[in-house]
Amino acid sequence: MRTLYITLLIILLMAFIIPLHASLAVYPSSPLYTHFAYMFGHANFIHWGINGWCILMFHHQFRFHRLLAAWLCSVLVSFIYYPALPVLGASVLIYFFMGFSAQWYYRYHRIYFWQMMLGMAIGFLLPYIAGIFHIVLFCLGFIYAKAERFIRHANTLNI
């Protein structure tokens, strides 16, 4: 329950920085700090609301090490790839957790897995979507889940 309250607080705080969205977006000539903060800004209240709802859907998976990995991966991707349009929003973190949960959904709730995949495919067809960022973070989340599972099993086997 504590993660729910913390998640709601962070989502609420992100609403207050919507007016700063132009100074938080990542683009080829953006200042260095934007690479570390772009995932907290949103272009408008609709963008914020959709991302906030999606964050709430994954809040049960939030652990400090997972959030740190998602944030570091999103920062790394912002340094590697520069799209033509500015990138802004928490959707990169959401896609990390979508990738993180994909294996579980495929195994136990296959219909949710396919709904998630369909939603991703439709999302990539929309204009002004940073598709490369989303795909890369989805894959990194998937890899992180595999690595976390391997480490957990290795610890139980005393390897």
Question: Which residues make up each language-model segment?
Answer:
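A detector for small-residue-rich transmembrane helices and their helix-helix packing motifs
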Residues: 1-159
